[in-house]
Structure formats: structure tokens, C-alpha cells
Amino acid sequence: MLSDQDHLTPAHRRILLLAWAGWLFDFYDLILYSFLLTEISRELHLAREEHSLVLGFSLGMTAGGGVLFGVLADRFGRRPILQITILTYSLGTVMCGFSTSLGSLLFWRGVTGLGVGGEWGSGHTLIAETFPPRRRGHFGALMQSGAPLGVGLAAVMGTLFTPAYGWRATFIVSGLPALLVAAFRKGIPESDLWELRRREAGGGQRLGAPLAALFRGGIRGTAFKALVLAVLNMSAYWFTYVWFPGYLQEERGMTVARSGIWILVIVAGELVGYATFGTVSDWIGRKSAFTLYAVLMSCGLALLTLFWDVIAPSRGLLLSAMGLVGIGTGTWSNFGPFFSELFPTSLRNSAVGAALNLARGVQFFTPLVITWV
């Protein structure tokens, strides 16, 4: 079995590359729309409220995608569903470039969200079931590092490519991830654990069985705790990247440019967090590592809000506090390996995909809650 290997094989590398690139373009496709709002508004005559509807709908569809493709992956296998999710969000993104109305744009952004929601769970589950357990955290974190790179790529395409070629061309060329599936279609093995479970069960299980199992017995409590953990952690993440720039500008008097520079410090810390979390969690355990990095993020946010007047005179303290916030977001590297280890093979993909993407769907309300508080 692949997970019993003492060293990485070419098959491991192909799995990691496809899952990492799939997650990079997953985040890229989800964020890209935000950089194209002005161009789209000008041509399709959309109001701000209509853009909010499109953004909220696509985010909500990620929850549906996480549940749907999670169930399908538990029934039909990790490999084909991972490939289908990448094809789904690639198709949705390309077709956005041909949208002529709010209705068509809403539909294709929904398709994009559906594929985006399914990719994360399938990719992490395939890695968890094929990589050596003692290095599972490290390689799960490596896959997660695609997220900030996806955001950066979306920013580059939105600010450099779009002014020259237009928003439609940006959407169309963003369908290139589909080529990943074509390139790696035959080189990606199926999960040994999934195939073993399928043989022991005498064939495929009933399609809705994994989802139904999440609401029974001890699994129900574990699934609920996983969902709550994901919701709280994701709320802290969106707090940092959605509310915090405005806080620096409106409450602390920073210019847009200066606040942007400080946010880049957080992003740099985020890359450090992703790079280190996996190894730390393999060393001291998933829960201990999560607690450590969550405390770092909490301390950083407390310094930047409750104790701003104390640290503001010192550039070094500001730099350190923002770096702590960024490093603390390394907790995201924990969810794939940790959740994969909490659930049995028969319903692993359903549980992992549902926990993260239902939490992501709930984030539609987070900006409203933050504003109210």
C-alpha cells in the first residue's frame, strides 16, 4: 500500500502535485471574481447588491459542493471525484466569460462554487489515505499552501491581465486547470484504503449512507465538533482579511497603501505558518499544534486591537503582532490531516468535505456579525 511506503514514490508526487495545484486554482477561482467587479459592473450594469448576491451564492454553493462530492467520493472513489471537481470549477469559470446577464453569471458562479467546495475534501482525503502517517501533517500542510498563492495569482490576473485583455478573457484563460486533469488522468492511483474498504464491503455502499452515518451514534458528536471548530477558525480568518484592513484605515488612521503593506506582513507570516505547521503537528500532535498556533493568532489579534495604543509607538512590536496573526493562520493546515484521522474510511470524504465547506458557507454571515459587534 502507498501509505506503508517509507519514502515518497512518483505516485505520491503526482498525487500531491494534482491536489496542491487543484487547491491553488480552487482558491484562485473563488477569489478572482472580487478583482473583476468593476469591469463586470461596467459591461453588465450590475449594482453592488447584485454583486453581493453573486458572491454570496457562489460561497453558499461551496457548502453544497463539499457535501455532494464528499458523498460521491465515498461511493465512487477519491481519484475520479477529485478530477471531476477540478473540471467542474474550471468549466464554471470559463463559462463566466460568456455570461451576458445577471442570471447566467449567477448560474456559472454557482457551478464554480460547487466544484470549489468539492475539491478540498477529495484532495486532502486522497493525501491522508496514501501518504505515510508519520508525514501526513507535513504533506497536508504543503497542499494547503496553495491557498495564499492562489490569492496572489488572482490579484495578478485581476490587476495586470484584465486591464489589457478584459474580464471575459480572464475568466476564459482561467479554465487552464482542466489541463491538469488531462495531464495526470492516468498517473494518479486510487486510495488503497478506499479500495480495501470497498472489497471488504463486497462492493460500493449505498449512495447516501456516509452522509446518514454522520448523524448517528458517536460519529454525530465528532462531526458536530469538527464543524464548530471549522466555523470558529474560518470566522477568525475572514475577520483578519475582510474586517482588519478597514479597521486599520478607519480606526487607526492608516492610508490604504500603508494598511496594505501591513496586511502583506500578515500574508508573509501565513506562508511561514503553513510551512511549519505540518512538521510541528507531526512532532507534537494535531491538537497540541492547533492549540499552539491558535494561541499565537489570538495573541496577535489582541495586541492589534485591545493593546494597540501600547504597541503602536514601536514598529517592531507592530511587525511582531501582525506576524503572529499570520503564523497563527497555519491552523488551516491542520484540518485536512486532523479531520481525515477522525473519521473511518467509509465516510471520511463526506465528513471532511462537509465540515469545511458548511463552515465556508456560513461565512456569508460573518461580515454582518463582525459589523454588528
Indicate where each model-derived feature is located.
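Helix-loop-helix hairpin linking two adjacent transmembrane segments in secondary transporters
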Residues: 143-186
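Conserved MFS/SLC helix-loop-helix module at the cytosolic interface between two early adjacent transmembrane helices
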Residues: 64-102
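Cytoplasmic helix-loop-helix junction between adjacent transmembrane helices
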Residues: 108-145
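Helix-breaking motifs and short loop linkers at transmembrane-helix boundaries and internal kinks
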Residues: 45, 77, 98-104, 132, ...
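Extracytoplasmic gate region of multi-pass secondary transporters
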Residues: 34, 219-271, 367
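C-terminal ends and interior cores of transmembrane alpha-helices
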Residues: 87-100, 296-311
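Central cavity-lining transmembrane alpha-helices of secondary-active solute carriers
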Residues: 56-69, 264-276
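Extracellular/periplasmic helix-loop-helix junction of adjacent transmembrane segments
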Residues: 34-64
